[in-house]
Amino acid sequence: MLLTASIILLSCNNSIYPTNGETIYRTGKNLRGEKLLDKKASRIKIVNNCKTCHGKQGDAMKNVSIKFSDLSNPNNGSVAYTDSLFYRFLDHDLKSDGSKANIGVIWKMNDRDKKDLLEYLKKL
């Protein structure tokens, strides 16, 4: 009975997605329900997740695609992102060339959450 109730509740909750990475991208929370946006450190306060600016498929904003296939493409006019450069971006708001991103959105993610988000972006 308890298992059935849990399954029903989870299936009704539209903020849970198949993977932790997709959940982070679409909701700004991990599967543990932790909010990952550091609103105190962020200049932009109205954003709660990646999808808000980047859209459902990661490419809603012109020249700001976060599909990893675009980020890691050396022909995009900037230094291609590697996994470690992407993690540095999340941790320090630095673009792939080392300059300040100045996006104003700061995330608090543990290593597992960062890896899961990157794996999701690689599938977009």
Locate each region found by the language model.
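Substrate-binding/catalytic groove segments of enzymes
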Residues: R32, A60-K62, L94-A101
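Electrostatic cytochrome c docking/interface patches
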Residues: C12-I46
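C-type cytochrome heme c attachment motif
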Residues: T23-N30, I44-K56, L85-D91, K115-E119
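Gly/Gly-Pro-rich "capping" loops immediately C-terminal to redox-active cysteine motifs
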Residues: E34-L85, I106-K108
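Bacterial Sec-dependent N-terminal signal peptides
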Residues: M1-S15
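C-terminal capping alpha-helices of c-type cytochrome domains
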Residues: D83-S96, V105-L124
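Intrinsically disordered, low-complexity repeat segments enriched in small/polar residues
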Residues: I7-S11, G98, L117
